[in-house]
Every structure is written in structure tokens, then in C-alpha cells.
Amino acid sequence: MFENNLWTMEPVGRPENTIQGDKYRFTLLTPCLIRMEYREDGKFEDRPTQVVWNRKFDPVDFRVEKKDEGFELFTDRMHVTYAGGPFTKNSLNLNAVGGQNAYGAVWYYGEKGDNLGGTARTLDEVDGECPLQEGIMSRSGCSQID
């Protein structure tokens, strides 16, 4: 836990919401928000970032089924399939339940998807369109922050 005079940061997720192997760690933050990490040395980042200061959210109901080197993870909002090894489009995908269509939307590791864009810091001196960085919403139901 990190503290200062203004706020408390809890950048480490709940242990009961974490699925971890020697080189991977998946932390469920909500039923539809997951942090996925892979490191060859098995040393994972536990400090707060500029974007995320708190990862200690409420407990999440989920189910895990081990599959060879990997697993399948289920919540009421997503289905994650991880085959093991480094993250690639062939080893990691996520199906968002109720995403783009009645069958959901599948995201494969490395895909950018159909991101809807983020927010502008200011609209001062903007006349018309302004460029936006990627945001946290997409038309497919899956987006990523790296």
C-alpha cells in the first residue's frame, strides 16, 4: 500500500481474484475488467501507474478450468482462454459476453479492435474535429490499455 497526505493507493489486486503461474498473472478487477501480465523472469509490476492507482476492487465470482499449460477463465461477462507460454494471438483470447452481437465478441492478443477513442484534455482553440488517443471503449466490447 502506498500512502501520502491526500490519498491511499492499493495497486495490488486481491489474491483471491488472481490466477498466477511462474511466468503469467491474471488479476480480475471486475467481472469484465482483467489485468493480464506475462514476464519471462516471473517478476510482476505491483506499483501504481499513472492510469491505475487502485487494483484492490471487490471480490469477483469466477471459475477456472485448467487446460494443459493454460486455463479457461469464466465470469458472467467474459470467457478468457490462455494456452500457456508468451502471450500471442494464438495463445490468448477473450470473449466478451454480450459484446458486438448476441454471441459476444472475441479479442485476440495484440489486436487493436475498433476503439472509440478517449477524451481531449481541453477543447480550447479547437474548431471542428480534434485527434484523440485510444480510450477504454470499443464497438466490439473489448479494449486494451497497455
Question: Where are each of the predicted segments found?
Answer:
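Short, Gly/Pro- and small/polar-rich lid/capping loops
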Residues: F2-G13
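A low-complexity, Ser/Thr/Gly/Pro-enriched, surface-exposed linker/loop concept
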Residues: F2-N4, L29-D68
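Catalytic and substrate-binding clefts that recognize carbohydrates or anionic sugar/phosphate headgroups
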Residues: N5, V64-D146
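Generic recognition of long tandem-repeat/solenoid scaffolds
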Residues: N17-G21, M36, E69-D76
